[in-house]
Amino acid sequence: MSSSNVEVFIPVSQGNTNGFPATASNDLKAFTEGAVLSFHNICYRVKLKSGFLPCRKPVEKEILSNINGIMKPGLNAILGPTGGGKSSLLDVLAARKDPSGLSGDVLINGAPRPANFKCNSGYVVQDDVVMGTLTVRENLQFSAALRLATTMTNHEKNERINRVIQELGLDKVADSKVGTQFIRGVSGGERKRTSIGMELITDPSILFLDEPTTGLDSSTANAVLLLLKRMSKQGRTIIFSIHQPRYSIFKLFDSLTLLASGRLMFHGPAQEALGYFESAGYHCEAYNNPADFFLDIINGDSTAVALNREEDFKATEIIEPSKQDKPLIEKLAEIYVNSSFYKETKAELHQLSGGEKKKKITVFKEISYTTSFCHQLRWVSKRSFKNLLGNPQASIAQIIVTVVLGLVIGAIYFGLKNDSTGIQNRAGVLFFLTTNQCFSSVSAVELFVVEKKLFIHEYISGYYRVSSYFLGKLLSDLLPMRMLPSIIFTCIVYFMLGLKPKADAFFVMMFTLMMVAYSASSMALAIAAGQSVVSVATLLMTICFVFMMIFSGLLVNLTTIASWLSWLQYFSIPRYGFTALQHNEFLGQNFCPGLNATGNNPCNYATCTGEEYLVKQGIDLSPWGLWKNHVALACMIVIFLTIAYLKLLFLKKYS
């Protein structure tokens, strides 16, 4: 059995215009007829850990075992029960599986797959990953802008988009939003066709689909398969996994690959599968769906199958008596290995590979891009901004909440006085403003978590670099959503509270609140990047902010904390924001206007000036005492964003 990493590099001269290697004869007709994908001795194993945490031991599990086959232009279905390995095989063929634990060869027209195979082939995931706030046409435009060559004019790209829309029958809904849980959009079938259209933009010779009928009713599922059948007649090689198709869908299949427990039960023409199982002693009842019949055989849970096996027990026993004592899956696998279908497949595989072992070359999982970094950044930012405007619950609602909260706080603390109560109220409202900015930034955890599947799919497909996506999301989503509330909040609260009537103090407060929001949001991204569940990231963020509040400077005087604990204050975002706001507001204030500052003060214990209050809080009165807090927040922003980027960069993108 040959063993290699599945991806290899080949010279450009060996590929055609679609990025796939040509046949040995270099016949141009092969391009229009599609590509022939063959797989030789595919084995896939994963290492799992079993047992309790103290003594967990790694256990190797075999997902695919010695799988061979050929996928030609047409509809190639991979059928099997849940957990049988059909999705794993599809991912292996599409070069979307982690190479570790993988062995075997996958060839295109008898040559190794090109390094950019993932970008030149199409792959439609099971859960449709399209931007719901955009229209069908806008989603296709995004795919065309990032996956088609920059040498193509906008007119040529629009022609390609219109052709795909017409081919998929999306003319009537082309300018309708796809839809989200808050926005009513297109139907399930139209959404699935939009996902297919995103891949057809590159005009791939090979199209992979992971269970394309999932979540669709029988009529819609039938319509989707009829569409795929029509596409296959145009010369495309369409490979898809499917769980339990109805007969009207099954009869459309050109090739059938039947898997169970990672073993091959059958591989060959779909319409000859019934005859194959009949020769093995399994007879399908009249009016029974062949696909259901095959699954019944594998699972061994059909009464009809049991009766038929009982009728043919003698004949089967004569042919292979030893198989009666073996597990059903192993028995069916051996029957296939000894069949004429297997021998014909092996002979054709030998002919395709030229009878020679391919040179094994270890390569990294590199992804090629057709567009530049700046081009990708512009389109990712544009889409993110449209998504922001199309999500009222995330944009308009947040602004409304900010306005209402600002008015409420302004009413509670309205017209702060310059007396002892003014000191307490000022400190209280400044502390609230700081902590509110922190907890409002918890919503930033959704920025990468919600779009995780979309990001992974588009990144592997070569839409954009991680850096383009990361920076684009920051510029179009994070910056405006944290900057605008800070501006609104400052404009409302500052004048209602009657804070220091100086322009520079007003803008320093606004800038401080923005820096607190950015640093808290950056921390949220650092925690949430790579996470799959929003609730887990939100819980971690809340715990961190509650801990930081203790060291903010209001709940405890930081000068009184023991030295072995005082260093924790330097990790508190609210502490830097609260200190800067106090320095900005209290410096130069007089809270005992009726007393002569130069005379003897009968109330020596009272705090009469802002400077006295700041000194008691351990705050430096110099200008550096103000700006060092902003420098610290800026450093935290850089550190947290770097962590978030690295987590996205090294995120496990292959299953």
Curated annotation (Swiss-Prot):
Regulation: Specifically inhibited by the fungal toxin fumitremorgin C and Ko143.
Topology in the lipid bilayer: Multi-pass membrane protein
Result of altering N436A: No effect on stability. Decreased estrone-3 sulfate ATPase-coupled transmembrane transporter activity. Decreased substrate-induced ATP hydrolysis. Decreased substrate transport
Residues with attached carbohydrate: N596
Impact noted for substituting C603A: Strongly reduced binding to hemin but not to PPIX
Biological processes per GO annotation: biotin transport; cellular detoxification; export across plasma membrane; organic anion transport; renal urate salt excretion; riboflavin transport; sphingolipid biosynthetic process; transepithelial transport
Mutation effect (D620N): No effect on protein abundance; no effect on substrate transmembrane transport
Superkingdom of source: Eukaryota
UniProt domain ABC transporter: residue ranges: 37-286
Binding residues for ATP: 80-87, 184-190, 211, 243
Keywords (A to Z) from UniProt: ATP-binding, Cell membrane, Disulfide bond, Glycoprotein, Lipid transport, Membrane, Mitochondrion, Nucleotide-binding, Phosphoprotein, Translocase, Transmembrane, Transmembrane helix, Transport
Phenotypic consequence of V546F: No effect on stability. Decreased estrone-3 sulfate ATPase-coupled transmembrane transporter activity. Increased basal and substrate-induced ATP hydrolysis. Decreased substrate transport
Residue(s) carrying Phosphothreonine: T362
InterPro entries: AAA+_ATPase, ABC2_TM, ABC_transporter-like_ATP-bd, ABCG_dom, ABCG_transporters, P-loop_NTPase
The record's account of how the chain is modified after translation: N-glycosylated. Glycosylation-deficient ABCG2 is normally expressed and functional. Phosphorylated. Phosphorylation at Thr-362 by PIM1 is induced by drugs like mitoxantrone and is associated with cells increased drug resistance. It regulates the localization to the plasma membrane, the homooligomerization and therefore, the activity of the transporter.
Reported impact of Q141K: Associated with high serum levels of uric acid and increased risk of gout; results in lower urate transport rates compared to wild-type; decreased protein abundance
GO MF entries: ABC-type xenobiotic transporter activity; ATP binding; ATP hydrolysis activity; ATPase-coupled transmembrane transporter activity; biotin transmembrane transporter activity; efflux transmembrane transporter activity; identical protein binding; organic anion transmembrane transporter activity
TM regions (residue ranges): 396-416, 429-449, 478-498, 507-527, 536-556, 631-651
Site positions (Not glycosylated): N418, N557
Effect listed in the UniProt record for changing H583A: Strongly reduced binding to hemin but not to PPIX
Result when mutating Y605A: No effect on hemin binding
Free-text comment about domains: The extracellular loop 3 (ECL3) is involved in binding porphyrins and transfer them to other carriers, probably albumin.
Subunit structure: Homodimer; disulfide-linked. The minimal functional unit is a homodimer, but the major oligomeric form in plasma membrane is a homotetramer with possibility of higher order oligomerization up to homododecamers.
Name under which the protein is recorded: Broad substrate specificity ATP-binding cassette transporter ABCG2
Species whose genome carries this gene: Homo sapiens
